[in-house]
């Protein structure tokens, strides 16, 4: 096996494999990444799931810089350059959780495939996509209080959304309790 300086090992066809994926068979933890556009219910479902399992809940919004938070508050869509340090910080946190064998439910938009690749979704990170139409999510946002989401932000997120090819897909028209039950069933998750 050939070691690579980039932090991975050589995999199939000589492509680098991130160390976390290489060592995943030795880990005893699960990171559940709940993705979707703003208003899909990531935080509500994530907190409920984490509470039922006795796991930690983390909202990826907490990894944003103050400048990003201000842009979001003003309704200015973030670009890939804005998101790069945010994704790096999240991946570093995931690596720490894996090293500590800590089960975590992470709410993160992860709208593009390249973002999910940066987070190394796969072996150690289980993806759950909260899927809903623009109309359903827009209606939900109108009912929310105390959140910085705007219609402009929702439009921009749907514009860049690349639906995942793998993972668990859950319809957001269900109650949060039903969504959590479906996630637990599909991923075989039991409390610690």
Describe each PLM feature range.
Residues 34:
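Hydrophobic anchor at the beta1->P-loop junction of P-loop NTPases
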Residues 143-182:
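Small-molecule kinase domains that catalyze NTP-dependent phosphoryl transfer to phosphate-bearing small molecules
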Residues 100-104, 126:
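Loop/turn-to-beta-strand initiation segments
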Residues 42:
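Conserved lysine of the Walker
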Residues 122-140:
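Conserved phosphate-donor/acceptor-positioning beta-strand/loop module used by diverse small-molecule
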Residues 47-90:
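Conserved substrate/cofactor phosphate-moiety recognition/catalytic segment
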Residues 38:
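The conserved Walker
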């Amino acid at each position: 096996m050939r070691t690579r300086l980039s932090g991975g090992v050589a995999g199939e066809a000589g492509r680098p494999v991130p160390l976390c994926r290489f060592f995943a068979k030795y880990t005893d933890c699960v990171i559940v990444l709940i993705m979707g556009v703003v208003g899909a219910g990531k935080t509500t479902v994530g907190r409920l799931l984490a509470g039922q399992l006795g796991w930690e809940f983390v909202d990826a919004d907490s990894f944003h810089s103050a400048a990003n938070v201000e842009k979001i508050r003003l309704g200015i869509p973030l670009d890939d350059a804005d998101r790069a340090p945010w994704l790096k910080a999240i991946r570093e946190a995931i690596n720490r959780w894996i090293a500590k064998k800590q089960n975590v439910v992470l709410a993160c938009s992860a709208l593009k495939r390249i973002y999910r690749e940066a987070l190394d979704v796969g072996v150690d990170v289980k993806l759950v996509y909260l899927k809903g139409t623009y109309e359903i999510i827009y209606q939900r946002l109108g009912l929310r209080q105390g959140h910085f989401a705007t219609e402009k932000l929702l439009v921009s997120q749907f514009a860049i959304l690349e639906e995942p090819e793998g993972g668990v897909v859950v319809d957001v028209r269900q109650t949060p309790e039903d969504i959590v039950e479906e996630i637990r069933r599909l991923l075989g998750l039991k409390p610690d």
